From Swiss-Prot:
Protein name: Uncharacterized protein YnjH
Cleavable signal peptide: 1-18
Classification of source organism: Bacteria, Pseudomonadati, Pseudomonadota, Gammaproteobacteria, Enterobacterales
Organism of derivation: Escherichia coli (strain K12)
InterPro entries: DUF1496
Keywords assigned: Signal
Pfam family, one: DUF1496
Amino acid sequence: MSRALFAVVLAFPLIALANPHYRPDVEVNVPPEVFSSGGQSAQPCTQCCVYQDQNYSEGAVIKAEGILLQCQRDDKTLSTNPLVWRRVKP
């Protein structure tokens, strides 16, 4: 009895591999827009400051028209984008 059971257990993986219906091919149709921007700009960042179509994270410092600006959290505002540009005093 145990020899027969052992033979069945050994033969099962071979039967499973021989059966093409056991592992069917899967096709996933994905539109080309998923892999390319299609000429569109990047999605807006929800936790960034934006300057000249560039996203900056919290703490970033830039110089705009001779003025230093830092991307900081705005504690007074309840919103989905609580970061704002604040002037940095020299």
